[in-house]
Amino acid sequence: MAHGEPYYSSKPDKDFNFGSTMARRQMTPTMVAKLPNFVRNSPQAYDWIVRGLIFPTTGKTYFQRVVVITGGLEDGTYGSFVFDGREWVEIYPIEHLNLMSSLKLIHKANALQERLRLSQEEKATLALDVQFLQHENVRLKELIPKPEPRKIQMKWIIVGAVLTFLSLIPGGYAQSQINNTIFTDMIAACKYSTETLTENLDLRIKLALANITISDKLDAVRQILNFAFVPRAHWLRTVFYYIHYYEMWNIFMFVLAIGTVMRSARPGTDLITLATSHLSGFRMAVLPTIPFHTTMTLWVMNTLMVCYYFDNLLAITLAILAPILGIIFLCFMEDSNYVSQIRGLIATAVLIAGGHACLTLTGTTTSLFVVILTCRFIRMATVFIGTRFEIRDANGKVVATVPTRIKNVAFDFFQKLKQSGVRVGVNEFVVIKPGALCVIDTPEGKGTGFFSGNDIVTAAHAVGNNTFVNVCYEGLMYEAKVRYMPEKDIAFITCPGDLHPTARLKLSKNPDYSCVTVMAYVNEDLVVSTAAAMVHGNTLSYAVRTQDGMSGAPVCDKYGRVLAVHQTNTGYTGGAVIIDPTDFHPVKAPSRVELLKEEIERLKAQLNSAAENPATAVTQQPVVTLEQKSVSDSDVVDLVRTAMEREMKVLRDEINGILAPFLQKKKGKTKHGRGRVRRNLRKGVKLLTEEEYRELLEKGLDRETFLDLIDRIIGERSGYPDYDDEDYYDEDDDGWGVVGDDVEFDYTEVINFDQAKPTPAPRTVKPKTCPEPEAETQPLDLSQKKEKQLEHEQQVVKSTKPQKNEPQPYSQTYGKAPIWESYDFDWDEDDAKFILPAPHRLTKADEIVLGSKIVKLRTIIETAIKTQNYSALPEAVFELDKAAYEAGLEGFLQRVKSKKGSKKLQRAPEDQGAQNYHSLDAWKSLLEPPRERRCVPANFPLLGHLPINRPIFDDKKPRDDLLGLLPEPTWHAFEEYGPTTWGPQAFIKSFDKFFYAEPIDFFSEYPQLCAFADWATYREFRYLEDTRVIHITATEKNTDSTPAYPKMNYFDTEENYLEAHGWAPYIREFTRVFKGDKPEVLWYLFLKKEIIKEEKIRNSDIRQIVCADPIYTRIGACLEAHQNALMKQHTDTSVGQCGWSPMEGGFKKTMQRLVNKGNKHFIEFDWTRYDGTIPPALFKHIKEIRWNFINKDQREKYKHVHEWYVDNLLNRHVLLPSGEVTLQTRGNPSGQFSTTMDNNMVNFWSQAFEFAYFNGPDKDLWKTYDTVVYGDDRLSTTPSVPDDYEERVINMYRDIFGMWVKPGKVICRDSIVGLSFCGFTVNENLEPVPTSPEKLMASLLKPYKILPDLESLHGKLLCYQLLAAFMAEDHPFKVYVEHCLSRTAKQLRDSGLPARLTEEQLHRIWRGGPKKCDG
């Protein structure tokens, strides 16, 4: 490259010449040598930009220019690079639209070339495979042994000749001897001649007189058939006479005998059958029955035919009894063999009985032979002629089908006559817009789409699982991204920029489904069809035959407005799913609290309606789950049943529509609320997560959860009907609430936006016994003055414990004040300033979705501050929060702390600066020299002291006055448990969890066993392959937790910290670590308040919990949250049960899974100090296994971040409440982000090691092994157990891993019954029984936390009743809970809680409803 000439990297780059030529002239060989890896033979854009715009500076170099290159990289991304004098540095991409379009086409061309190359390679490989298979076929044909010609044995020829001779002699017949010689009876011959002459004379007379009758003609035909005109001594008469005499049997038998000897595979049996058939006299009738026989039944038939020769009555009796005896005595056979034997016996019975009847009546069995032969021929007639003929073209494609049946001309005539009636109307024209259609192309196939708004709409099944699809429009191909797929079979695709000027289809505001038009592309041709439609809930049906490529086509009315999206065809009717404006935007799922409140109101409305009208029923539509799996016969059957069910539903709706004018409607009645589809009922969710389940064992369920549970039960009571009668369908049902029949709505009374409220109010508790009269709530008019607002506030009850109100039509929370109370308060200048965050704290989503509304609100705030008039703020903030909630964003009122309810938190001193408590290693600047050792044991280092104000003593044992309502217990086993209390000695004792025995270097000592354990772990968790690292702002964790030191000095919870500073510190610290810094994280240690044995409390044996800085925890969530979520989704098939629910048959399903393995041994394993004694080498190894599942690119990119994260897990700087700082280097910390998941993987890895230790690395035997784990809980089934298993396995874990298993904690049985898992013992029906009911009773009578009210106590008792569902009826714990419920129910008659759960409700919760029943 000559100096001063523009530089071009390739010919396309020179042809396009994007950017500045001056910048190209500045390129030097050094700059060219260090160019980034752009796509080969692709253009780049060169810019000549002022240096100060790229590198901020105030010096003289600000106006110097630098070269910026923009292009496409080999990894498929788009980037810009600036040369800083030494190397190219990546900067924020500069958009060049022409370059981006060119790169897109180049990428597509390269992809197509790669696909072509791979296809050609695959074609060549397949062609080579075909040649190999052809050669192999020829070679194998040569190896096939050729059948040798059968050798005829002389003995069978002799036997056949003897049997044939015996059968042909006159004595071979079972009849008396008769002289059948010809010309011996001369008198009869003469008499016959005279009669013949007389008949001929009479016939000639009649012919002469022309007096021939029909009877004479029939006699003539009969004489011809009887050879009357053939001379008596003619050879033809002699041949036919002898053939008739022998009935062709002897000749046929002789031929069969020769053929049997020559070709039969069992000549002896066949010859004996011929002989017995001749001996018995059945002859030809035997032959058609032989194919029905097996070898056994054939010998039975031969025996009975021989018996018939001697005693026919005995043979008939045995033949009739043979099928009956065979049905009884041959039942041990398999089905196919059993049916064959019975069929042969029945054929024998028919032959013997029928043959005897024929011989008795006619003297021959010819009629029986004809009947059997006719039946067989009719049975085989379907083989000769098919049901239809298929006409194919040269390529083998079927172009036409012709039925083989003969058309009924008369039927077709009347059908056409009926259809071609007199024209009674004129068809209307319809509007179509072909320019609004496009073709959606995916690797799985093609579909039709249409432009509407800013999206391309099509069917979801046409898109499949693809994130990007190709949009074909007017011969051009565009790549587009799938934006959103709702629950319906609809997909919304982002419209490419080049296609925005195209025509658009609008949605119909007033749908008319009487006549619909379907437009679609089929084989690049536009097809249009018009038909009448029927509405079935959210779908349409119409008589249109669906062709390939029509999925996703618009279904429009006569004005060209979209009604629905064409979906499918089930044989006779086309189907479409109705589309409405709400489908275009994803709706944020309501929170758990909102769902609970909504369902409480629905339940109460349903109960009120049921009380007024007992016939009212609530129908819950079943949830249809589509899974991608292999298709089996049962799947095909289910698919056909679903299609037929849909067709019958369509037919039923059409018939009901025809009969509607003739049906009478009862006056004075309305069916609103009966059987209506409850669209807002919660569907298919687990009753309890693992966190709630753990809490349930200690504290029970609260009132909200229990009411939600009751609502679920009532919603599932009518689980069997699957249809929706149109009598119960209400088109005006908007899903906001359900009320009784006679409730009249006043739509102007109160405006309630509960569905989109940003800050849900808590549930109300039990109202006062005598509530004071309340003023009627009026709607809030935001245009009124401040005085009227104050007057309105006086009308609305603002108590933190509101009085009980009657449920309103649009209210979702029982007795809840209107949502306006959250916004209608005395606004001041501080409220106005802090309602909106600073512009730099707004997220990208806020700016895109709410940009205009935020600007509007800022203007209103500025005006309000200037005029000191804040009356317009409530409405403006409410509208902003409403728009935010509809877009799935958090409301702004929720983002700030309410002045009335917020806690005054201490802020950081001004002279410290933000860095002192934002950074992960801020604690180091506050570290002081060590002081007195108080809570740190002597074998742990004392690194220093930090200023902290936390207690190290806790001797509180709460006394709950509500427990005075409960009866005195007679069972005192619970007294050995109690709430934990501690002093400094408990902190020292808690460090003992890390010590039991020293592990060896098992990776070096047992490499083969470790390799087997690794193989088993990778095989078990293979579904984690290609998991991803997520952004820190997308992580989820409990924000109501301590933010650790030093943030805990200024904020009580992480939620307070987030509200004060947002995500900026999190992103800053993550970037800091990503750039290479390795700050040392500080963990905060505290003891757990729980119910344990009194002996442990006296010994100060309390569990310690450590928690790290929330920024560090969320960095761990970035690395492992995706894997943790997948583990929770695979509890049914994987070993880890984190996320598992024992409710709705979950417990029994898991136990049945272990039983179905068919192993003889079941093992319950209980560890001691499990997570504290995990060897650091093993813990680090498990973390490496998990990291190997991460996507390769991200695995390399964030490798150093992961190493830093694991290093801070293994080497923990720990702060105690006494201010002492120490170092922990053992175990799995109980407060890290993935404690349970890591414990699960360690548990499984150690089991695989243990299996190989006792059985060797046998991979095939390991596949019969199965286990379920939850942290340190373990229940497994194994095909073999060595002798002295308990002693040997305890020694193995102690000597190799240094882990502690106490004697008696390893239980091995030949049945799973009696073993326990997660606090439940398995009973005979594989159902759960609480393992330690005395501990549950202690948490009731000796709690570590006081319950807030009597409703919470009653809810806790209901929870214990649920846990004791499968306990013995006379168990003291179950009896005591029932006694307590009777006490508390008397005090809570108006609370809305049930007095107790019925047996049916308990079984529904544990086993599931009629659609989910598992046991």
UniProtKB/Swiss-Prot annotation:
Key words of the record: ATP-binding, Coiled coil, Covalent protein-RNA linkage, Host membrane, Hydrolase, Membrane, Nucleotide-binding, Nucleotidyltransferase, Phosphoprotein, Protease, RNA-directed RNA polymerase, Serine protease, Transferase, Transmembrane, Transmembrane helix, Viral RNA replication
Catalytic activity, reaction form: RNA(n) + a ribonucleoside 5'-triphosphate = RNA(n+1) + diphosphate
Chain segments annotated as transmembrane: 154-174, 239-259, 286-306, 313-333, 344-364
Coiled coil region boundaries: 104-142, 587-616
Gene3D superfamilies: 3.30.70.270, Trypsin-like serine proteases
Enzyme active site: 461 (charge relay system), 489 (charge relay system), 551 (charge relay system)
The UniProt record lists the keyword Cell membrane: no
Domain (RdRp catalytic): residue spans on this chain: 1160-1286
Cited Pfam families: Astro_1A, Astro_p19, Astro_VPg, Astrovir_pp_1, RdRP_1, Trypsin_2
Cysteine pairs bridged by disulfides in the record: none
E.C. numbers: 3.4.21.-, 2.7.7.48
Reported modifications of this chain: Cleaved by the viral and host proteases. The protease is probably autocatalytically cleaved.
A single GO BP: viral translational frameshifting
Region (Disordered): 753-813
Modified residues (O-(5'-phospho-RNA)-tyrosine): 693
Any Gene Ontology CC annotation: membrane
GO molecular function: ATP binding; RNA binding; RNA-directed RNA polymerase activity; serine-type endopeptidase activity; serine-type exopeptidase activity
Keyword Manganese part of the UniProt annotation: no
Biased composition, class Basic and acidic residues, residue ranges: 783-795
Biased composition regions of type Polar residues, renumbered to the chain: 800-813
Marked site (Cleavage) residue numbers: 175-176, 419-420, 664-665, 755-756, 912-913
InterPro entries, sorted: Astro_1A, Astro_p19, Astro_VPg, DNA/RNA_pol_sf, Mamastrovirus_p20, Peptidase_S1_PA, Peptidase_S1_PA_chymotrypsin, Rev_trsase/Diguanyl_cyclase
Family per similarity comment: Belongs to the astroviridae polyprotein 1AB family.
Name recorded for this polypeptide: Non-structural polyprotein 1AB
